[in-house]
Amino acid sequence: NGIYLKKGQNTVKITMSWGYFSLDYITIEKMSASNAYTAAENLVDPYASQSTQRLYSYMKDVYGKKVITGQYCNGGLNGTEFKAIKSATGQTPAMLGLDFMRYTPCRVQNGDTSDAVEKAIEFSRAGGIVTFCWHWNVPDKYLLSGTDGGNPRWWGGFYTKNVDRSKFSLTKIMNGSDPDGYNTLMSDVDEIAKQLKRLSDADVPVLFRPLHEASGGWFWWGAEGPEPCKKLYRLLYEQLTNVYGID
């Protein structure tokens, strides 16, 4: 990460992100230019839908030239954040971020509901780009007992701190030592595949961002290092693309 400073006098401000920060000192050093990423000419999936190919082509065309503005907003096109941005700027973000979290079986069993797919279809038909992440809950049987900050553990069941690591190990699941855990995760994937299929049937291409922020370790999919996470990522691709036919 770097900060571009113009020649002459500059003012650098440090602001809080999550409401707190720890700071010992600041060092300013010259850094070399970052290597520009070169996007592959073609998608990995040779059978990608026409809509997916058009979106990929557009993103390649604007890469390094323009910035695509986006906003996560559960309410979609007419949600609180989008209304605030439109009021302040007169413009609507080009990209809407949503979450498959509330479609996860563990959360559904605890009474959670979602209309994220409907919001995505609405936004796409209005001409926008849709991206999804997935805060993937582990099933209740893998959660610690008690509560987390007064909330039931399942409410934050994607956080490593809420998972009983003596019962759940992604490493064991991915190396074949825990077939029951593997089948359980695949059942979750099946449910999310149904939602992706709904989007595919509506001709809505999605920038899907599963297993996000894995390097931090605060989510269970990144808590045991890169190797099991990479295996799970590849498995997700194989299942969603080759088994469920989502292109």
Give short role names for the model-derived ranges.
Residues 1-52:
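Extracytoplasmic
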Residues 4, 10, 82, 87, ...:
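Surface-exposed substrate-engagement region within the catalytic domains
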Residues 9, 23, 93-97, 127-131, ...:
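Extracellular structured ligand-interaction cores
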Residues 18-20, 33, 74, 101-103, ...:
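Short, solvent-exposed loop/turn segments at secondary-structure junctions
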Residues 31-87, 92-95, 99:
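Boundary/entry segment of secreted carbohydrate-active catalytic domains
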Residues 98, 110-111:
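The feature represents the first ordered module of a protein
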Residues 106, 112-242, 246:
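Substrate-binding cleft of extracellular glycoside hydrolase catalytic domains
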